[in-house]
Amino acid sequence: GSDGCGSGCEGGYYRVTPFAENSISLEAPETDEDFYECAVAFGTFISDLADYPAETLHETIPNFHNTADRYRIFHETLERAKADPQLAPRVDEAADMIAFALEREAEAGRLQAMRDSGELPTRVTHNDTKLNNVLLDADTRKLMYVIDLDTVMPGLSLYDYGDCVRFGASTAAEDEKDLSKVGLDLHLFEVFTKGFAKGCRDLTPKEAEMLPLGVKTITLEL
């Protein structure tokens, strides 16, 4: 229209980006090289934005990876469920899983504590590091773009790393109901770690040391 807005605008704002010709995205890695390239992509994303003031970014989802706060909510919900006659039996049924989560509470809050103390740097992070958020060249299978930027917020590099390993190196689909099929492919774990370290060139020694805890923490959050 004359106001520069198309007929379907409805008064909102739209972000327009160039169409990535000859690009593909993957729901799961088809080769080790695919997973490696995605790791390089997300590591490079963090590294390239290392000098951007992360604190100026709007938090689309406040406390998104504040694991200690998630445990606080978990405790409150658990107490309410125990006091509810209809929900209390379900608490008993899930006793083993509840115990599993509670036994790991101290470790799960460690990264947030290290961030709060400044031991781990707050960075610009993607916060949705699934493989399908990387566009690869269909012919060369090399990185073209990192997409889906609506959750870019201040965070820890370890969360981006951990979320993609959790998703991409799993031995089962995200919605698999048979938990006996769910595990971590250590070979893909190694492939991704090498690619991420190559892309995120300025990881601090402490960040590198804590990478495995990033995977455990994100898995517990979910």
Where are these regions (language model features)?
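Catalytic activation segment of kinase domains across protein kinase-like and atypical kinase folds
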Residues: 132-173
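Protein kinase-like catalytic domain
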Residues: 46-53, 197
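ATP-dependent phospho-/nucleotidyl transfer catalytic cores
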Residues: 5, 20-38, 51-126, 131, ...
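Active-site activation/catalytic loop segments of kinase-like enzymes and analogous catalytic loops
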Residues: 158-201, 217-222
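Short amphipathic C-terminal alpha-helix that caps PH/PH-like domains
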Residues: 38-45
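Short beta-strand micro-motifs within the conserved protein kinase catalytic domain, predominantly
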Residues: 1-10
